[in-house]
């Protein structure tokens, strides 16, 4: 009995659902789908093929804007396409353009252009030929190109060590450099000397654990502290004098 009751309920539910779908196919929004084939907006689809906006599609093939498509092939703006290719266009024909253009023909352009021919351009351009440009650019010949690398900042093959030594002596005294910075090669010595002048931070030493030395710079920089208003380190003689005066006071 229970199984039969359940089956009856399922069949009734399925029948109700199928009835709803069938009802939707016949009427939706109070208008059937089949009805749309014959009329839509009080005008049928079949009627659209014969008339649209009081003018049929077939009528457009013969006349459009009071002028047919076929008529446009023969005349357009009171001048035919065939007429454009033959005699005049702006009072000058296309064929005439090959012989003269601005009182100078295209063929004439190969021999003269601005009173100078194209062939002449290979030998002279701005009173200097292209071939001449390879030998002179800024009044410098090809044999001097190799010497350009010196002026462009490239290191020469044989550097002048005497000038480098003189520059080192002017930048920083050799006594202020550490042992590992005293190199034999003058070029490396010059680079190592410049890091003090550029303000590069030195390596922190092991005996300075407070971290104050880490913010100090090279000795050449620390000597400038008095000029920048920073308090300089007290002299040893001044410290001894202070101790002696304090000892006398205690005595």
Swiss-Prot record:
Sites of Tryptophan amide modification: 89, 152, 198, 228
Residue stretch(es) of the prosequence: 1-77, 93-138, 156-187
The entry's keywords: Amidation, Cleavage on pair of basic residues, Neuropeptide, Secreted
Secreted in keyword set: yes
Domain of life: Eukaryota
Compartments where found: Secreted
Residue ranges, annotated region (Disordered): 1-22, 227-251
UniProt protein name: Prothoracicostatic peptides
Lineage: Eukaryota, Metazoa, Ecdysozoa, Arthropoda, Hexapoda
């Amino acid at each position: 009995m229970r199984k039969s009751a359940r089956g009856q309920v399922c069949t009734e539910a399925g029948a109700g659902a199928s009835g709803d779908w069938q009802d939707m196919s016949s009427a939706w929004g109070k208008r059937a789908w089949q009805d749309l084939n014959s009329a839509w907006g009080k005008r049928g689809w079949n009627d659209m093929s014969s008339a649209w906006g009081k003018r049929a599609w077939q009528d457009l093939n013969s006349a459009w804007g009071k002028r047919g498509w076929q008529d446009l092939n023969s005349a357009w703006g009171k001048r035919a396409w065939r007429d454009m290719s033959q005699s005049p266009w702006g009072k000058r024909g296309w064929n005439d353009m090959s012989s003269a253009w601005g009182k100078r023909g295209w063929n004439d352009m190969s021999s003269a252009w601005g009173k100078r021919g194209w062939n002449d351009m290979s030998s002279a351009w701005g009173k200097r030929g292209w071939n001449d440009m390879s030998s002179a650019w800024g009044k410098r010949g090809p044999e001097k190109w190799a010497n350009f690398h010196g002026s462009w900042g490239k290191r020469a093959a044989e550097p002048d060590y005497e000038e480098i030594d003189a520059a080192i002596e002017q930048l920083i005294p050799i006594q202020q450099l550490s042992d590992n910075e005293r190199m034999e090669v003058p070029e490396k010595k010059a680079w190592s000397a410049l890091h003090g002048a550029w303000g590069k931070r030195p390596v922190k030493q092991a005996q300075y654990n407070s971290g104050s030395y880490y913010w100090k710079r090279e000795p050449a920089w620390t000597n400038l502290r008095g000029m920048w208003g920073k308090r300089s380190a007290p002299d040893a003689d001044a410290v001894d004098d202070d101790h002696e005066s304090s000892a006398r006071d205690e005595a």
